């Protein structure tokens, strides 16, 4: 059996595996003791019986065990497997420095589990939430979340609060699908309750890991609520208990592919869409702002307040002074997110790649991660642990003055092309290399804008040169 959501719960020393089937939500737990972390050293290397660990101001020793499982490195040298007790993955950072050469000691533990234990990841219909926050900028309620908007397969809705809603209920009379609260805290309590009741598999946002998620965690904490409630396992990176709930610097420094809310998949749609766009050779987008992308892809624009056309003024004053536009603006944002995703199959493409690789979701964004998963699964040898190279400075090239040195100077009517990746195919397709240049035009079967546009050619004077 395979699993779609693969989560390492270091606080519990367990893997959590979550999926859905015809009976609803399913999950399974695997204790680290039943699948302990490991790496390799060269056979014949010193075998230390114990190692000293320093953690949270304390020192203690852990027991190290060694096994021969027939593994070799790329050069055919025999390797010895290293494991330890307690079986905590984070101890690997201390252990691997005991030897000059180690192998696969830099593999994330959930990658390791997927490679060793999973044979497939079955397809199922995920519950997806497209979400966005608005928060107050300036004034008495500076920094407070004012509105949380959602779009799901069942429609869209928004949570909002107003300090004067009891006295001015008419401010939301003309806005559909809105639930109103008297305080930010009440709104957040309801949002967390609905999140846990509906239990979405995937939370999809635009730059969410950089802005929205840290803000949500910060405001939950500021309102005396435990941000760990965002996770079905009450485990959120950067949120910990030390006499009280505290936040570490990790909360404001999530990278766009990591999964800080354990048990849910977080997708930054901006990153996935940008990679999809670039990989299809459409050229580099000048802006990744949601309004720009929505206009390019959907021909749609975000709402603009007639009362406060300046964005900064709108975000500072729109909440209380142009409420209807403010709430509709928030709802429209998540509608645009879902449409961009649906019309480009962006999240489904990422999930398909995950099923193809049989890997955790966060391994499916960069070639280095995908390559490591593939080679660990297919290779008959173990790769050396990666080492950070030494940074060295070097002298730049000398540029000669063509007038005094008699070298070649300016050439007129010369064009320079710079395409990202796939150079051979593009040189031939665009007929721009002197080695393969052709003067024989060839008709296109489809519009040259492919893969963006598969329509028939109508009135465009494109030339394509036969180079084969």
Task: Describe each region flagged by the PLM.
Residues 1-54, 106-108, 112-202, 393, ...:
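Conserved RNase H-like, two-metal-ion catalytic cores of nucleic-acid enzymes
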Residues 1-108, 222-261, 299-316, 324-335, ...:
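Non-catalytic nucleic-acid-binding interfaces of large nucleic-acid enzymes and RNP effectors
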Residues 86-121, 373-405:
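Charged, flexible boundary elements
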Residues 98, 419, 433, 443-468:
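Conserved catalytic core of nucleic-acid polymerases
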Residues 131-133, 269, 417-419:
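Residues immediately flanking
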Residues 145-147, 214-226, 234, 281-282, ...:
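Short secondary-structure boundary/capping segments
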Residues 158-159, 167-171, 175-178, 182, ...:
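Active-site-proximal helix-loop-helix substrate-binding element of RNase H-like nuclease domains
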Residues 311-441:
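Common nucleic-acid-contacting/processivity interface regions adjacent to the catalytic cores
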């Amino acid at each position: 059996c395979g699993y779609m959501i693969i989560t390492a719960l270091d606080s519990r020393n367990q893997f959590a595996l979550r999926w859905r089937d015809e009976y609803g939500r399913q999950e399974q737990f695997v204790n680290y003791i039943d699948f302990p972390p490991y790496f390799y050293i060269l056979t014949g290397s010193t075998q230390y019986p114990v190692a000293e660990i320093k953690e949270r101001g304390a020192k203690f020793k852990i027991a190290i065990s060694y096994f021969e499982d027939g593994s070799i490195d790329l050069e055919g040298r025999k390797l010895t497997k290293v494991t330890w007790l307690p079986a905590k993955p984070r101890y690997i950072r201390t252990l691997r420095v005991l030897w000059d050469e180690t192998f696969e000691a830099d593999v994330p533990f959930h990658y390791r589990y997927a490679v060793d234990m999973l044979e497939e990841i079955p397809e199922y219909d995920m519950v997806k939430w497209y979400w966005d926050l608005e928060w107050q900028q300036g004034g008495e309620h500076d920094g407070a979340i004012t509105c949380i908007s959602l779009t799901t397969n069942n429609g869209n809705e928004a949570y909002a609060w107003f300090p004067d809603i009891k006295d001015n209920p008419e401010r939301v009379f003309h806005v559909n699908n809105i639930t109103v609260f008297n305080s930010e805290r009440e709104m957040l309590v309801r949002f967390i309750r609905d999140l846990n009741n509906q239990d979405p598999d995937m939370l999809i946002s635009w730059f969410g890991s950089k802005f929205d998620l840290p803000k949500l965690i910060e405001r939950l904490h500021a309102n005396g609520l435990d941000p760990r409630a965002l996770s079905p396992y009450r485990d959120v990176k950067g949120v910990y208990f030390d006499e009280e709930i505290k936040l570490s610097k990790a909360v404001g420094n999530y990278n766009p592919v990591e999964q800080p809310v354990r048990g849910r998949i977080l997708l930054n749609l901006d990153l996935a869409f940008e990679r999809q766009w670039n990989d299809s050779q459409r050229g580099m987008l000048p802006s990744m702002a949601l309004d720009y992308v929505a206009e390019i892809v959907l021909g749609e624009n975000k709402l603009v307040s007639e009362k406060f056309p300046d964005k900064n003024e709108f975000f500072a004053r729109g909440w209380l002074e142009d409420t209807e536009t403010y709430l509709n603006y928030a709802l429209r944002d998540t509608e645009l997110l879902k449409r961009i995703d649906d019309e480009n199959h962006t999240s489904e493409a990422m999930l398909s790649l995950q099923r193809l690789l049989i890997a955790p979701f966060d391994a499916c964004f960069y070639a280095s991660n995908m390559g490591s998963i593939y080679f660990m699964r297919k290779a008959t040898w173990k790769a050396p642990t990666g080492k950070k190279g030494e940074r060295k400075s070097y002298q730049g090239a000398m540029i000669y003055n063509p007038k005094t040195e008699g070298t070649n100077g300016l050439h007129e009517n010369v064009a320079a092309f710079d395409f990202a990746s796939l150079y051979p195919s593009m040189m031939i397709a665009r007929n721009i290399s002197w080695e393969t240049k052709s003067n024989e035009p060839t008709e296109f079967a489809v519009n040259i804008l492919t893969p963006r546009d598969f329509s028939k050619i109508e009135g465009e004077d494109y030339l394509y040169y036969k180079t084969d």
